[in-house]
Amino acid sequence: MQLWQLNPQARWRRTLKGGAALLPETAATVELDAEAFTAVSLLKTPLTARRLRHQLIAQFNRNFTLAETDILLRDLAAQGFLVESRAEQSASSVPGSASPGSQSHAPESVHLQLNNVCNLRCPSCYLGLHEDDRDLLSLARLCALIDECAEMGVFQLALGGGEALLSPKFAPVARYARQRGLVPNVTTNGWLITEKLLDEVQGSLGELRLSLNDAVTVNKALLEEKAALLRARRMRFGFNLIVTQRNLNRLSELLEWACAQGAATINLIRPKPAPGNDRWYTDNALTRADAARLLAVLKDMEPLFTQTALTVDCAFSFLFHGQSARQLESRGVAGCAMGERFATIKWNGDVYPCSHLHGEEFRAGSVLSESFRDIWERSQVFTKLRRDLPQVNGHCGGCAHNAFCKGCRAAMQQRTGDWLAADTDCPVPVAQAQTKALI
């Protein structure tokens, strides 16, 4: 009989809905419901499908067919999360492997702000930089944070700033994160990328994201040069692009250009209001009509994305309205997941549920005075947010798509003063009203 066990290289974490797994080498992830995650947790020792089925029946007191158990095992094996086993081996015996069930609920990704300074002054910036780069988070403290994240089961570390590459701690942090089994990624404006710097992080970064910003205040020739350096080293890279009123008419051209550079991914970002960028936001924010146009452009451009993956940030989840739960899950669409899948540690040690939330009422604690785990698990801010997030107001609250969207809470907080307000940019209510008018 065929025996299955966990891939020793896979990392696992609990989620509020079940669990998830990551293969650090490829950054491939999979989401599992509670039953599937329990099934996987039983594979810390090798089992056959038949034996696993018997244990699941005993645990959940319901019938599991051998066919559905076998399908689950073979599907996870095809994705690389399970491997065929010899009876004497156990995945949990592999040093450094994180097995399911060994952690409490943990964030999938932690955004770690290495500094608060930048060599550019982009009008779209949401951070409100203050040119304050005091060494509040020493390299030793950052490494201790990485240790905590690894022990909790965090998958990815999103390194940022400011401009992360200005920090002398960037390369050591990236290397140490990889050593601890996390996948460190970084977003940068690209100006400071050099051969020497790439030597220091070769083999450590999961992906380097070059910021196209809003494609107005960016030097495309510079980004082409940096992309060529990354291609020559076979380092995985992508682009971040803020989609705005001003560049929506050029979006097809920009996507074609980014694909031509050899990008592994292109991530489209929704404009977000923040202290200090009010004028830019007013001039560039997408209307509901713009959002509908964006969806049409993406559908037309779909054949382009054979070698390059196109992703959107969670604030654009309303673009997928109308798709089934299975389709949304397969695309990784989970909507606003601040405080559940993500958290931010700012340059001064303050912890927030989201990089785009500002204000003392959203400050969950400081890693200068307490552990990140304690903040994540016990902070009143996170507890209240997780309780209230499903209860968004207006059309968002009554939307059938709510579980996979919830709008952009940070944008609504800045715009209306109420983080639970209905998302005013969502095109779905207009489309529904137009449909009703035709009936």
Where are these regions (language model features)?
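A C-terminal junction/extension of Radical SAM enzymes
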Residues: M1-L3, A274-E360, P390-N393, F404
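Canonical Radical SAM [4Fe-4S] cluster-binding loop centered on the CxxxCxxC motif
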Residues: Q103-A140
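Flexible mid-to-C-terminal extensions adjoining Fe-S/redox cofactors in radical SAM and related proteins
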Residues: H356-I439
